[in-house]
């Protein structure tokens, strides 16, 4: 029977920012790519799934939850001198992105005399609140009249769907998307010595940065795992502590654990096969310095698979690529993936 050696590593993975794209006036979307490595086999999947679920479900945000539009009879009515219907104005208010550092509940005001195009920048806010998309269109005033709206903003998680007919004190309910995280992707890439790297991509709406979202999500996960550390061996339900009951529970758990272990082993093989190729492994994992990294990018070399199609002599032919840069690439390939790049 063969012997297997498991290398138990005491160190923790290093997190780095691979790339970053800030939002523009036209598209309010922040993007960051994070790299966590080295991880033991299987850890990247555990980490990636947990972080993705947390970021998409539990990050707190702020949104407009109600609006009182002066002169509006009902949601589908119109106002003289206002181009949009009340319904369209409410939909536009729903897409206003709010940064809120402190306050949970607050009232805000729009009070503008036309003619004018009303944008999110026209919302009067307190010092602790700002708008991430100030150029977002709300309404068009076509006549010299006053357009006045009272807004209620609040903090929350997830998505709030409200009854459109539930109008209280003249306030129309506004469906609210609180979560500032718009999308999360992760991929797993094999390194040398049975280690893995996790690449995590996060998009946010500009209310918080992807880095802040990652920090908040990590804190939420930490709080989920803290309670077991306060348990002691004798803190169990003695009312259900009979010997027969304990034997039954142990047998049930043993059966479930054995079945679950088999399924997990099969899943791990599927995952390893899925990410075995280097065609989707970005060169960011090499952790190169700026010069060789930019040279590779300018030569349209984006993945490890692209790099392996070339030899060391081919790399020297790339513009601005010197011997020291090639040496750094060769050493990084060997260190991170156990790959020896061919000379010619």
UniProtKB/Swiss-Prot annotation:
DNA-dependent RNA polymerase catalyzes the transcription of DNA into RNA using the four ribonucleoside triphosphates as substrates. It comes from the Eukaryota. It catalyses: RNA(n) + a ribonucleoside 5'-triphosphate = RNA(n+1) + diphosphate. The lineage of its organism: Eukaryota, Viridiplantae, Streptophyta, Zygnematophyceae, Zygnematophycidae. HAMAP family: RNApol_bact_RpoA. In plastids the minimal PEP RNA polymerase catalytic core is composed of four subunits: alpha, beta, beta', and beta''. When a (nuclear-encoded) sigma factor is associated with the core the holoenzyme is formed, which can initiate transcription. Belongs to the RNA polymerase alpha chain family. One of its GO terms (cellular component) is mitochondrion. It holds the Pfam family RNA_pol_A_bac. The keyword Plastid applies. Its EC number is 2.7.7.6. SMART domains: RPOLD. The keyword Acetylation does not apply. Its main location: plastid. This is DNA-directed RNA polymerase subunit alpha. SUPFAM superfamilies: C-terminal domain of RNA polymerase alpha subunit, Insert subdomain of RNA polymerase alpha subunit, RBP11-like subunits of RNA polymerase. It is an enzyme of class 2 (transferase). It is found in: Plastid, Chloroplast. The N-terminal domain is essential for RNAP assembly and basal transcription, whereas the C-terminal domain is involved in interaction with transcriptional regulators and with upstream promoter elements. InterPro entries: DNA-dir_RNA_pol_insert, DNA-dir_RNA_pol_RpoA/D/Rpb3, DNA-dir_RpoA, RBP11-like, RNAP_asu_C, RNApol_insert_sf. Residues 1-232 are annotated as: Alpha N-terminal domain (alpha-NTD). Residues 270-344 are annotated as: Alpha C-terminal domain (alpha-CTD). GO terms for biological process: DNA-templated transcription. Keywords: Chloroplast, DNA-directed RNA polymerase, Nucleotidyltransferase, Plastid, Transcription, Transferase.
């Amino acid at each position: 029977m063969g012997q297997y050696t498991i290398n138990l590593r005491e160190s923790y993975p290093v997190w780095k920012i691979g790339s970053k794209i800030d939002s523009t006036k036209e598209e309010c979307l922040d993007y960051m790519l994070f790299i966590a490595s080295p991880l033991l086999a299987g850890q990247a999947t555990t980490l990636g799934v947990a972080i993705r679920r947390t970021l998409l479900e539990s990050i707190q945000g702020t949104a407009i939850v109600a609006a009182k539009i002066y002169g509006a009879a009902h949601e589908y009515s119109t106002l003289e001198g206002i181009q949009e219907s009340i319904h369209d104005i409410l939909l536009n208010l729903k897409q206003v992105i709010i940064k809120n550092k402190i306050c949970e509940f607050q009232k805000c005001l729009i009070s503008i005399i036309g003619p004018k195009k009303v944008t999110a920048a026209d919302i009067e806010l307190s010092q602790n609140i700002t708008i991430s998309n100030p150029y977002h269109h709300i309404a068009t005033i076509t006549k010299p009249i006053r357009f006045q709206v009272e807004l209620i903003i609040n903090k929350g998680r997830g998505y709030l769907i409200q009854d459109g007919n539930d109008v209280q004190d003249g306030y129309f309910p506004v469906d609210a998307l609180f979560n500032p995280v718009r999308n999360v992707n992760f991929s797993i890439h094999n390194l040398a010595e049975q280690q893995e790297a996790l690449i995590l991509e996060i998009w946010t709406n500009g209310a918080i940065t992807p880095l802040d979202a990652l920090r908040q999500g990590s804190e939420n996960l930490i709080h989920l795992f803290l309670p077991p550390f306060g348990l002691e061996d004798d803190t169990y339900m003695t009312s259900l502590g009979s010997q027969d009951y304990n034997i039954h529970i142990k047998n049930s758990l043993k059966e479930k654990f054995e079945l679950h272990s088999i399924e997990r082993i099969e899943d791990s093989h599927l995952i390893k096969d899925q990410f075995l190729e280097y065609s989707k492994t970005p060169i960011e994992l090499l952790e190169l310095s700026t010069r060789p990294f930019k040279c590779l990018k300018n030569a349209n070399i984006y993945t490890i698979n692209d790099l392996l199609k070339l030899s060391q002599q081919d790399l020297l032919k790339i513009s601005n690529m010197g011997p020291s840069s090639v040496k750094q690439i060769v050493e990084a390939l060997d260190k991170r993936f156990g790959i020896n790049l061919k000379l010619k």
